[in-house]
Amino acid sequence: MNINVTLIGQMGTFLVFWWFVNKVIWPMFANIATERQRKIADGLNMADKAKFAVQEAEHQSQEILSKAKMQAAEIVSRANKEASEMIAQAKEQAQRSSEAEVLQAHVQIEQEKRQVRDELRAQLSHLVIAGAEKVLGREVNDRDHERLLHELTEKF
């Protein structure tokens, strides 16, 4: 056998093999590789979109959290203000109540002073009349009694 014929036979076999691989097997692998590239690209795009969505969600959650903090601070502020107003109203009401009680006590004291004064005047006038009866040695009639009482009350 001649090496040229063998070489030509091997070249022919190689060409048939090359043609078969190019027409049948290579397109399958090319399709598989292309499909994988497409899936990988889609996965990367989805990962980028998911990353952006996560960043957006974090941003929104921060905004919501800051709004919630502001609302909570506002609610606490309003509650403190209402509590202060309630305390002020309670103090004012207590002040008015105590002033009214003090005024009522003053009025009651004045009434008691007048009553005691009137009782003392009556007792004093009876003592004076009794003393005058002893000094005069006679009983004082109603007209004299009224006149003496009137004079004594004017002096007091």
From Swiss-Prot:
Disulfide bonds: none annotated. GO terms for molecular function: proton-transporting ATP synthase activity, rotational mechanism; proton-transporting ATPase activity, rotational mechanism. It is a single-pass membrane protein. GO terms for cellular component: plasma membrane; proton-transporting ATP synthase complex. Keywords: ATP synthesis, Cell inner membrane, Cell membrane, CF(0), Hydrogen ion transport, Ion transport, Membrane, Transmembrane, Transmembrane helix, Transport. It comes from the Bacteria. InterPro entries: ATP_synth_B-like_membr_sf, ATP_synth_b/b'su_bac/chlpt, ATP_synth_F0_bsu_bac, ATP_synthase_B_chain. It is found in: Cell inner membrane. The keyword Transmembrane helix applies. Pfam families: ATP-synt_B. The chain crosses the membrane at residues 7-29. F-type ATPases have 2 components, F(1) - the catalytic core - and F(0) - the membrane proton channel. F(1) has five subunits: alpha(3), beta(3), gamma(1), delta(1), epsilon(1). F(0) has three main subunits: a(1), b(2) and c(10-14). The alpha and beta chains form an alternating ring which encloses part of the gamma chain. F(1) is attached to F(0) by a central stalk formed by the gamma and epsilon chains, while a peripheral stalk is formed by the delta and b chains. F(1)F(0) ATP synthase produces ATP from ADP in the presence of a proton or sodium gradient. F-type ATPases consist of two structural domains, F(1) containing the extramembraneous catalytic core and F(0) containing the membrane proton channel, linked together by a central stalk and a peripheral stalk. During catalysis, ATP synthesis in the catalytic domain of F(1) is coupled via a rotary mechanism of the central stalk subunits to proton translocation. Belongs to the ATPase B chain family. This is ATP synthase subunit b. It comes from Dichelobacter nodosus (strain VCS1703A). The lineage of its organism: Bacteria, Pseudomonadati, Pseudomonadota, Gammaproteobacteria, Cardiobacteriales.
